[in-house]
Amino acid sequence: MEKVKLTKNLKLKIKNAQLTKAAGLDKLKQKLAQAGSSDTKNSPASKAQTKEKSSKKTAGTPAPAPEVDSGATESTARRIRAKDRSSFAAEPTVTTALPGDASHLTLDAIPAMKAPEITSVTQKEQTLGECTDTSSVQQEEKKESSEETSPERVEETLIIRTRTEPKSVVSIKPKFGPTGKHINHLLAKTFKAPAKETKAASTEETTQQQPRQNDAASYNNKQQPSGTSSRPASSAPSYRRESTNNNNNAKRGSERDRSKRSDESVKAFTGRDRYGLNEGSSEEDKWRKKRVHKTKKQAEEHVVQCPAHIKIALPITVKDLAAEMKLKASELIQKLFIHGMTYVVNDVLDSQTVVEYIGLEFGCTIEIDSSAKEKLCLLENAVRDEVNATDPEKLIIRSPIVAFMGHVDHGKTTIIDALRQSNMAASEAGAITQHTGAFKCTTPVGEITVLDTPGHEAFSAMRARGAEVCDIVVLVVAGDEGIKEQTIEAIEHAKGANITIVVAINKCDKPNFNVETVYRQLAELDLLPEAWGGSIATINTSAKTGEGLQDLLEMLALQAEVLELKADPSARARGLVIESELHKGLGAVATVLVQNGTLHLGEALVFNDCYGKVKTMHDEHNQLLQSATPSTPVLITGLSAIPKAGDPFIVVKNEKVAKEIISARLAGQQRSAALQKKRPNFDAVLQNKKTLKLIIKADVQGSIEALAHSILNIRSEKVDVEILSSEVGDISESDIRLASASKATVIGFHTSVESHAEPLIKNLNVKVCLFDIIYHAVDAIKEIMTGLLDPIAEEKNLGAAEIKATFKSSQLGTIYGCLVTEGTIVRNQKIRIIRDKEVLWKGSLSSLKRLKEDVKEVKKGMECGILLDNYQQAQVGDILQCYEVIYHPQKL
């Protein structure tokens, strides 16, 4: 044990000596010891203390060993002992002793010491304490004889206590840079020894010339005067507290200095630039490309020369024009704004003058390309004008196109069935025609192309379209009913198109048939019949018996000869769309009527909004055709979309040209739509109007047109109708989702709901209405519009009672004793209180009793007790009126 202990003490002694030498405390201790020995040898107090201590040594009383003896010389025997010390142990004290006789430093010796030297010693001891753990290692000096300080001398002795708190051991984690190498590899490369040595040497020289003062020392020098180092014995306790606080402050200041120095050293060795790269480490930069620091780019003016000549097509947006001129859109907008024209980037320029002026301002000649406009205007010339401009030698006689028009249920379709020897009327929903039928029938007088138009008021557009495309109009009038509204409308369409009119007075087999009434009505409409000396041919017919049908055919053939109907079969085909629909297997199909030229299988067609290539072509008997001559209606497939009923078509060179034409047309439509944005109806908002939103799906395009026309003609000052979408086909899932999002109603006409969309209707709670007859759909929409209106409330008086007395109840409140003066007071009806002809309150009855029994009603002349619901301010003499609220639906 002794060997182990000696070895341990020896190691600690060697370590402590090395640390002391490294900190430079040995020289300072020698200076302090020499200064102290010269003063204490001449003082008589030190000799007296030596005698007292020698006497106490003989007495054998042990003296407490000081923790740190800063005044001992190198010759004094030292013993370094390591021990564990808890936080509850006594605070270590620093006692300054003289080297000669090992006595304590008294107050008389304090003036002999210089303040800067004490400050430097304190700093050096604190620096030494920072290097070594004072909580685990304690230095002690064991003298040859034990010493004990008397109580009287303790008061005169200067004891400087320094509390050293245990320091937490800082564990330095290994630092790895972005290269994956340890920081020690970088220290060897970035550390410059000569620069550090020079700095250290200059620091030592400065320390030798003038001791360094820390933050605590400088603070003490500022706060304390120069002569406060020597104080009387009575102020010793306060001096101890101040010295302890100053030492703590000095310790904190030294810790901050040390942390700053350590941070600076770390930055010097592991300095990184703003992108995380090591500064000065060229080896690691070989594989990493150092990012160049981005500086603020100076505004460079790019001088772009505008082209001298460009060619554009109108209309064009400001953005597109700027791109063609190699300029910014803001430059064009600025130039236009200077001259009083306000435009934005997406505005459309359709004026040739404005476009040419812009080019003149920027030194550019702008030429308007008219080739695109010529493509868009392919269908502007009428078919009749084209036929008139054709060489007469190429023209041949074509079949007449006859349209049967008239009021609903007057027998138009029945006459056509009799001519064709078919039965189409029986298969139609509601026994009315709701589609435009086009077919060719062979008669004894030749072939006739027949158009069967609907007679219902909703199909006004179909009748107008039939009048435009046909050559002769057969006006069917029922002899027992006379001319009706739709008959008059058909006459107006025929007059507007300047078409020959032939009147067929139908139902001549009925007993109430009156032809004179029909003649008179025709004369009133400026259609004077031949029987009355006019030019309008009239024929009495009966679709059931067949009477007069042969005469009708002969009259049609005669009118066709008079008109001299001709066409050019060698020209490219032109015509009109009679009807269109979406077929489940064939896609978009259309019934077209060829007016001029010959339509062949495989040719490319252009409509208003779509194009196509004729893949198949069938007649009314579903027979495949290779070509269609003038006045022939055919059903074609292979279209890109569903064309609208009434749209003209023309044959073009190939499908590529057709695509280019449609693309140009769609672009123009989008620009026009951008110019004519739908503005909100502020009048409807101010008038608090209701709006019914509809989504229409139908089997054919003509049905959509007719249904939409009928719905929009429903006039109402309280409800507006808005059609969000109108398409051909079955009701799909997207339609249901659109209706749910916009809170709209889906109207299906001659169509059905797709299978995968049916469960979505229940989940999203969307209202879907399916119809086969158009007037049923119109009536249902009117009911829906009426349901949107709030009902009108009407108050009907049932009776009245006068309050005769009031009774207070702690549980129920105020009970009113009343006498019924008029009618009947009913318990479940409303009550109003009237005082001086003014209504004070409206509410309901909480209880109605007569002779302590609950009753439902009390009649005139009887007394009752009434308890009102949450009202107790009625007075004697007030009138209680009982009334009933009746709600009446509003009218459109």
Curated annotation (Swiss-Prot):
Q: Region (G2) spans which residues?
A: 431-435
G4: annotated span: 506-509
Q: Where in the cell is it found?
A: Cytoplasm
Pfam families per record = EF-G_D2, GTP_EFTU, GTP_EFTU_D2, IF-2, IF2_N
In this chain, the stretch annotated as G1 covers 406-413
The annotated regions of Polar residues compositional bias extend over 35-48, 212-224
Q: What molecular function does GO assign, one term?
A: translation initiation factor activity
Sequence positions that bind GTP: 406-413, 452-456, 506-509
Q: Which keywords fit this entry according to its UniProt record?
A: Cytoplasm, GTP-binding, Initiation factor, Nucleotide-binding, Protein biosynthesis
What HAMAP family does the database record attribute to this sequence?
IF_2_B
The protein here is known as Translation initiation factor IF-2
Give the organism, scientific name: Chlamydia trachomatis serovar D (strain ATCC VR-885 / DSM 19411 / UW-3/Cx)
Q: Name the lineage.
A: Bacteria, Pseudomonadati, Chlamydiota, Chlamydiia, Chlamydiales
Q: Which gene is annotated as encoding this protein in its UniProt record?
A: infB
